[in-house]
């Protein structure tokens, strides 16, 4: 005879909360299972902790586990744990009459638009059961009390009574009477999916009672008896049925006394463990093989390849957390797609999954790192909004970055593997130099470049510094589109001739790197394409430079006047050997390469383009025969039309060779054709045939307008 039930009213705030949960639509109802499994795990933690000092606490049940039993016929989902259990007092107080401190706060958060998945953070995760159930019973047995059953259909009250039906031994059994429109939560596949997503690394076995089939050979008599028995049972129970799949037509007909055999399919149930991948991060790293790390990495990331490197560590003291970080072998094709949710580092709190896209857990430039972080100090189910303000998370982030730096540093010791890593993730490191001022120096150590002395190999800035000549003060570099382009550039002629190594930076992101990486190990990084290049020189070289400056002063002034606003100034160069001239930019303006990159931007700022790309100066090579002959020609006749033609042509050609683009390529081409005609001895005024005229088109004169002519007069 059932015990008489006591009825209790829900505390007002809890009644409001339940009403809110029941009457509001939430899309991610699946979190109810996470919350109930999390509570079960907490109950198991408590009994395990008590058993450390008193092993007899486990006499009522040695095995610690969580079990899920879906029953489609009855429409119920049962969650059983062998945890500490609840006394009658616990059931009354914890499940209804005493509001948790977070109840009101959670309701306010919900009404303000917070996600239902935050419910556990406020200590009221149990009530999420009413997202999918219209009635819940909780049977519980604590070592210090009898077995009791709590029941409520959320109508403002609940009942508690003693329960003598099925002894639990110890622990809690929650039965959810699933709503008619939520029966998909009784499907094996759905339950497995939710457990795999949210509770895969709970520290106790999660078992699911699954229904399976097996073939069994029986005699006709047995089959008939079984069938009759099944038909009888089918009226009032959902026990396994036996299904006839046909007779064996090849039975031995000669022996009439022999009983015919039948193959039948027999349904049966068994427990299937859902979380076989144990929390590997909770184990001692010394006890874990590379194969185990590999298996865990693949289960975590769904990658088919092994990881490239792994870092397993724990932090203890005022703050406690464990972490397992992996570097993959390849970069995903959508690594820098900001709109895509990245599944990189999974955040757990006490082995309960919280979120897999915690942006504040690691900087964006390290978004290729995969792994898990399991904190003992964060509140369970902390929201994204609260994470941004959480001091614990900031400390975890700092430690993760530090350990990632250590991991990459360890990888640099294996040259072959580091090359694989660098080929895939060099952009991330360079983005880090751009964004992370605290770790800029460390990240600079990881960078690798081709240089004028490295051949086909990459070398580090540290290697470069170790090879610097005694009289070399700076690290020289050049940016450009490709190794071939920069290695043949006019800018590196003198530097290479002096025996100084030049770093080749050929990725667009390198331009952003050098804006922030001004020096390395006390050595200033100097661009060979910018004005003011200083090279070590002796007294004789210094004297020659001063003489050249005086000798070509008048030519520089003339060229400056001819080019007018196209250049800021014309000066004698100390960087050229084989080229007659080059275009350099100001220290704070864009290089030719940067200007090219910015012009390619779809959303470029035209105003910024104007003042950042404006400052150019033309440097001439005093030792080049073209420049020397031009000087002599200009000294002989400053008004010589050919001098102006040649100056403009030299300027436009040096623009191209220095990496800039021409505003009017057609005009430049016409000038080249005119020069070709002169070289071939074709008279400028000689009439062309009709065919020639059609093919040549209207070539602009080299001196097109009166404005240019007036500049020539000013030179006089």
From Swiss-Prot:
**Modification Phosphoserine, positions:** 219
Where in the cell does this protein reside? Cytoplasm
Stored SMART domains: HATPase_c (SM00387)
Binding site residues for ATP: 39, 81, 100, 126, 384
Keyword tRNA-binding in annotation: no
What keywords sit in the KW lines?
ATP-binding, Chaperone, Cytoplasm, Nucleotide-binding, Phosphoprotein, Stress response
Q: What is its main location?
A: cytoplasm
Segments carrying the region annotation (Disordered) are 213-262, 687-716
Q: Which SUPFAM superfamilies match?
A: ATPase domain of HSP90 chaperone/DNA topoisomerase II/histidine kinase, HSP90 C-terminal domain, Ribosomal protein S5 domain 2-like
Which intervals carry biased composition (Basic and acidic residues)? 225-244
> Which parts of the sequence form the motif TPR repeat-binding?
712-716
MF terms in GO: ATP binding; ATP hydrolysis activity; ATP-dependent protein folding chaperone; unfolded protein binding
- List the Pfam families hit by this protein, alphabetically: HATPase_c_3, HSP90
Family in the record? Belongs to the heat shock protein 90 family.
Subunit structure as annotated in this protein's UniProt entry: Homodimer. Interacts with shu.
Entry text on domains: The TPR repeat-binding motif mediates interaction with TPR repeat-containing proteins.
Q: What is this protein called?
A: Heat shock protein 83
């Amino acid at each position: 005879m059932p015990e008489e039930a006591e009825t209790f009213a829900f505390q007002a705030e809890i009644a409001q909360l339940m009403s809110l949960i029941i009457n509001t639509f939430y899309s991610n109802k699946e979190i109810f299972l996470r919350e109930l499994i999390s509570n079960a795990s907490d109950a198991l933690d408590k009994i395990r902790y008590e058993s450390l000092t008193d092993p007899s606490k486990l006499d009522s049940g040695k095995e610690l586990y969580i079990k899920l039993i879906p029953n489609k016929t009855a429409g119920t989902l049962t969650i059983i744990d062998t945890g500490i259990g609840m006394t009658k007092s616990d059931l009354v107080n914890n499940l209804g009459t005493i509001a948790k401190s977070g109840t009101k706060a959670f309701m306010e958060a919900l009404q303000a638009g917070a996600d239902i998945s935050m419910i556990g953070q406020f200590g009221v995760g149990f009530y999420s059961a009413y997202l999918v159930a219209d009635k819940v019973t909780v049977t519980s047995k604590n070592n210090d009390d009898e077995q009791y059953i709590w029941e409520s259909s959320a109508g403002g009250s609940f009942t508690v009574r003693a329960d003598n039906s099925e002894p639990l031994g110890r622990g809690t059994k929650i039965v959810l009477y699933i709503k008619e429109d939520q029966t998909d939560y009784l499907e094996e596949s759905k339950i497995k999916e939710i457990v795999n997503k949210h509770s895969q690394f709970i520290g106790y076995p999660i078992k699911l009672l699954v229904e399976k089939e097996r073939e069994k050979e029986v005699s006709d008599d047995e089959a008939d008896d079984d069938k009759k028995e099944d038909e009888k049972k089918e009226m009032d129970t959902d026990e396994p049925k036996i299904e006839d799949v046909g007779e064996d037509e090849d039975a031995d007909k000669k022996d009439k006394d022999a009983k015919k055999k039948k193959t039948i399919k027999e349904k049966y149930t068994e427990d299937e463990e859902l979380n076989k991948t144990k929390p590997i991060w909770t184990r001692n790293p010394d006890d874990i093989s590379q194969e185990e790390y590999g298996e865990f990495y693949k289960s975590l990331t769904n990658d088919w390849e092994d990881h490239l490197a792994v870092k397993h560590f724990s932090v203890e003291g005022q703050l406690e957390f464990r972490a397992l970080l992996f570097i993959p072998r390849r970069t995903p094709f959508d690594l820098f797609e900001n709109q895509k949710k990245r599944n990189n580092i999974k955040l757990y709190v006490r082995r309960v999954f919280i979120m897999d896209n915690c942006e504040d857990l690691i900087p964006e430039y390290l978004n290729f790192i995969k792994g898990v972080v399991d904190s003992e100090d964060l509140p369970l189910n902390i929201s994204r909004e609260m994470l941004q303000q959480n001091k614990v998370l900031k400390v975890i982030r700092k430690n993760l970055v530090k350990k990632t730096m250590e991991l990459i540093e360890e990888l640099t010791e294996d040259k072959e593997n580091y090359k694989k890593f660098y080929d895939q993730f060099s952009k991330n490191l360079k983005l880090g130099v751009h964004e992370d001022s605290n770790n800029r120096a460390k990240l600079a150590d990881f960078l690798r470049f081709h240089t004028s002395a490295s051949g086909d190999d990459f070398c580090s800035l540290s290697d470069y510094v170790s090879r610097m000549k005694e009289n070399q003060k700076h690290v020289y570099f050049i940016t450009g589109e490709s190794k071939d382009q920069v290695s043949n550039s006019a800018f590196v002629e003198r530097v290479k001739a002096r025996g100084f190594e030049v770093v080749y930076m050929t990725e667009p992101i390198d331009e952003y790197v050098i804006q922030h990486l001004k020096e390395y190990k006390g050595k200033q990084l100097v661009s060979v394409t910018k004005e003011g290049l200083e090279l070590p020189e002796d007294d004789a070289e210094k004297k020659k430079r001063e003489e050249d400056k005086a000798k070509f002063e008048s030519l520089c002034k003339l060229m400056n006047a001819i080019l007018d606003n196209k250049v800021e100034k014309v000066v004698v160069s100390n960087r050229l050997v084989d080229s007659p001239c080059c275009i350099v930019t100001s220290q704070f303006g864009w290089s030719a390469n940067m200007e090219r990159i910015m012009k390619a931007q779809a959303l470029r700022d035209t105003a910024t383009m104007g003042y950042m790309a404006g400052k150019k100066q033309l440097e001439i090579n005093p030792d080049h025969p073209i420049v020397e002959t031009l000087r002599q020609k200009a000294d002989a006749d400053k008004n010589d039309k050919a001098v102006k033609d040649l100056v403009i042509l030299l300027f436009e050609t040096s623009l191209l060779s220095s990496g800039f683009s021409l505003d009017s390529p057609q005009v430049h081409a016409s000038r080249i054709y005119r020069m070709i005609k002169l070289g071939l001895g074709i008279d400028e005024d000689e009439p062309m045939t009709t065919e020639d005229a059609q093919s040549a088109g209207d070539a602009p004169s080299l001196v097109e307008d009166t404005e240019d002519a007036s500049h020539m007069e000013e030179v006089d």
